[in-house]
Each structure stands twice: as structure tokens, then as C-alpha cells.
């Protein structure tokens, strides 16, 4: 039985980079990992494979949507540390539902007998607004992880994600493992002062604090995980939070909870205390 993770977060805050490095940390600790990119940009797995791979939708289009004509080699690429990667892709802009594509991807994996092959399956999901479609990975997940930065817009999105997790937990087993604070900057960004307060309010915690560091940004553009980058000053410190997250996830029965989101207006009321 696979450990299934659903990683969400506001767009543009390093969610896919964080997901790829969590996958890398898990793989280097011996887990067989599948990362599933659930974003029409289909770049979630770029740091692992070093390329934009063919999406499930593209593969299905080539066989006129006959699932039975596809094999694992048509939709899965293997990258750094033996991590298998799949990109769901999405419909043309302005048409269709991206969430439907996620469901099709899971169905295809199940038909190919691949879904239970892995120790860990990580869904990296578009997460500014959780519509019914893009919340689909929560139906399969054991744990959700929210990636957030120490700013209002990111926390507002995180609260909406908590609402989705709470709603899904009524019918499904998913719980919130915690929040990963990304791009933490104690010099000009306030560290994690806003995130600490928010996490306490909704009944969760910060799983790890990923520092704001140029090397992490460069690794993304290089098409590599941070683990695959050359050793340079600061690299070891940057790797610590990813290893902390992996260690937490692979322990037996990691502590998790159903979040208790707060109202939108309450978040605005909290803003004054974040000056």
C-alpha cells in the first residue's frame, strides 16, 4: 500500500520545486517514489527529469483516448534517484476541466497495475483556488501538505486549502500533515511570524522551514533537484528541511490533523497584527 501525499500551495511560491526536493529526499532514503504533476503547465517534474515530459493527455490524444493502447513507458519518465514521474497535463486554455485530467491519470495508473507499485505517490497540485476538480487528489491522499510563504496572499490561499481538506476529511481519510514554510527570510521577510500564528489558529504546525537561497532558485532553472547540484556553501543547510519532511513522512503513523479553517474576514482582521 502506497503512502499518498497531496501537495498544495499558492501558485508561484516554489511548490513544485519543494515537491521535487521532497520526492528526492524520500527516494534517497530508499523509498520508491512516483511524483504526479497536476498542473496544465506540466513542469512539476522538470527538476527531476531535466525536461518537460509528455503529458497523459498528450499520450491519450495520440491513441484517440483508448487507454488500453498505452503502456507505462508512454506516460512515465524516470529521473533523479530513480524517481518515476508523470505529468497529467491539462485541456487547452479556456476549455475543459484540469481536475478531470487528474482523475484520468489515476485511472490509467490503476489500469496498468502501477498505482500500488510505489512506496510513496506525491501529487503536486495547482492550488490557488481548490475547485472540485483540482481537489480530486485529496480523495486518494493519506496526507495533505501545504506550501506557503510568510505573506498574506499565500496564507489566504492556505486557509482556503484548509477548508478543502476539512471538507474532504468528512468522506475520505485525508489529514493535514502540516505547512512547509518556503523562502524563509529573517532579514527582510519577517521569518515565519505570520505563518506561526496562522498554523496555531487552524490547528496545525510548520513541518519545516526552507530558507530563501539563490541555490534553490538556480536548481530549478538547471532542471535539477537541490540534491543533484554541485556542493557549494549553504547547500547542506538548504537540504536540512527537505530531509526533515521526508523523515517525518516515513515514520510510522506521523502526527496529522484535520484543520479548522478560519473565516476570510478573520484573516483580514489578523493582518493588523502582522505589521
Curated annotation (Swiss-Prot):
GO MF: 4 iron, 4 sulfur cluster binding; ATP binding; metal ion binding; oxidoreductase activity, acting on iron-sulfur proteins as donors; oxidoreductase activity, acting on the CH-CH group of donors, iron-sulfur protein as acceptor
Q: In which pathway does it act?
A: Porphyrin-containing compound metabolism; bacteriochlorophyll biosynthesis (light-independent)
Protein name, entry field: Light-independent protochlorophyllide reductase iron-sulfur ATP-binding protein
Where, by residue number, does [4Fe-4S] cluster bind? 97, 131
Name the encoding gene, please. bchL
A GO BP term here is: light-independent bacteriochlorophyll biosynthetic process
Q: Which PROSITE patterns would you find in this protein's record?
A: NIFH_FRXC_1 (PS00746), NIFH_FRXC_2 (PS00692), NIFH_FRXC_3 (PS51026)
Similarity-based family: Belongs to the NifH/BchL/ChlL family.
- Give me the segments passing through the membrane: none
